[in-house]
Amino acid sequence: MKAPDVGDVVWLMFDPQAGHEQSGHRPALVMSPAAYNHKTGLMVCCPMTSQIKGYPFEVITQVDGVDCAVLSDQVKSLDWRVRRAKKKATVSKEVMLHVQAKLKALLSLP
């Protein structure tokens, strides 16, 4: 697989996990650009879930016709090669902007 890119939805294994972190084989929204991901073998991403709970940092979207939430408060840096990330979809620019806005608020970025 070529390096994942910003806005890609990839499926990968989140285990091992600890505490309240998402676990198992699940989708994630890629937040870092392909150039970084290719060079480092890492990617910055937010896990996704079909269990929508209405939390303030969820961003609702659809992937393959399934409603799901991007968990923008659980941002991670993961080795996409070792975790065998597979691209399944791409989100809209609007969804990316919404997730980026949530991350800015969470991290108190200007």
Residue ranges and their predicted role:
Residues 1-110:
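Conserved functional hotspots at enzyme active or ligand-binding sites that engage polyanionic ligands
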